[in-house]
């Protein structure tokens, strides 16, 4: 499994619009990507101007294909709520309970 960690600075007072953008524009796009497994989004408490999105992928190649293909659409959608350019870092997943959780929910 592979992960992409995107950190961003949200414009002031855009927390609700950020959540709507994730739900209505970004998640539908991600769900169409080959190898996509999950997206976890965090917003810092308080001012709510720091956000992190972690996407999980079957393989490194799936994440790379997304970043070279559809990711610019995500950046464009986020431009209305994000200051600057999001910072992307990639990681190999060494441990996760995601698949165990999914199996329990399906049972």
Predicted regions and their residues:
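An amphipathic, aromatic/His-enriched active-site/gating alpha helix that lines ligand/cofactor pockets
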Residues: 24-37, 47, 56-90
